[in-house]
UniProtKB/Swiss-Prot annotation:
Gene3D superfamilies: 2.70.40.10. Substrate binds at residues 71-73, 84, 88-90, 98. This is Deoxyuridine 5'-triphosphate nucleotidohydrolase. This enzyme is involved in nucleotide metabolism: it produces dUMP, the immediate precursor of thymidine nucleotides and it decreases the intracellular concentration of dUTP so that uracil cannot be incorporated into DNA. GO terms for molecular function: dUTP diphosphatase activity; magnesium ion binding. Belongs to the dUTPase family. Its cofactor is Mg(2+). The keyword Coiled coil does not apply. It comes from Shewanella woodyi (strain ATCC 51908 / MS32). The gene is dut. Keywords: Hydrolase, Magnesium, Metal-binding, Nucleotide metabolism. Pathway: Pyrimidine metabolism; dUMP biosynthesis; dUMP from dCTP (dUTP route): step 2/2. GO terms for biological process: dUMP biosynthetic process; dUTP catabolic process. Its EC number is 3.6.1.23.
Length: 152
């Protein structure tokens, strides 16, 4: 099932030199976001840089949100991860998509124009309504915290 999402091209190179974000295979969950920068840039170890993707989206449907997630190869091979770990795009946001790149490695990393930096994934949203209670019904886990599940 495909859901239409409005996209605005902010960088004219998208659609001509670089493709719009798209699913690589029928089973892909995410679409690659690219670095739409003017020139190559270096990210020093420990440094974080905010990189434009050249697009804006408007999800519009309050039952959906978008998340920006890291690409596994960049983190594993080069230490490049998202500076905010995950980017959450609310359904009513209409501004440019940016990727926060953090170099947690020990060498500078060069980002080239058009490099694939992150993935955009759409997820369902459930808005909760809190119900105040004095006690919870008993559960198997109870109040066991970090590292508690699956232990005897």
């Amino acid at each position: 099932m495909k859901t239409p999402i409005e996209v605005k091209i902010l960088d004219s190179r998208i659609g001509s030199e670089y493709p719009l974000p798209a699913y690589a295979t029928p089973g892909s969950a995410g679409m690659d976001l690219r670095a739409m920068i003017e020139t190559s840039l270096s990210v020093a170890p420990g440094e974080t840089r905010l990189i434009p993707t050249g697009i804006s989206i408007h999800v519009a449907d309050p039952s959906l949100a978008a998340v920006i997630l890291p690409r596994s190869g960049l983190g594993h091979k080069h230490g490049i991860v998202l500076g905010n770990l995950v980017g959450l795009i609310d359904s009513d946001y209409q501004g440019p998509l940016m990727v926060s790149c953090w170099n947690r490695g020990d060498k500078p990393y060069t980002i080239e124009i058009g490099d694939r930096l992150a993935q955009l994934v759409f997820v369902p949203v459930v808005q909760a309504e809190f119900k105040l209670v004095d006690e919870f019904d008993n559960s198997l886990r109870g109040e066991g915290g970090f590292g508690h599940s699956g232990t005897s």
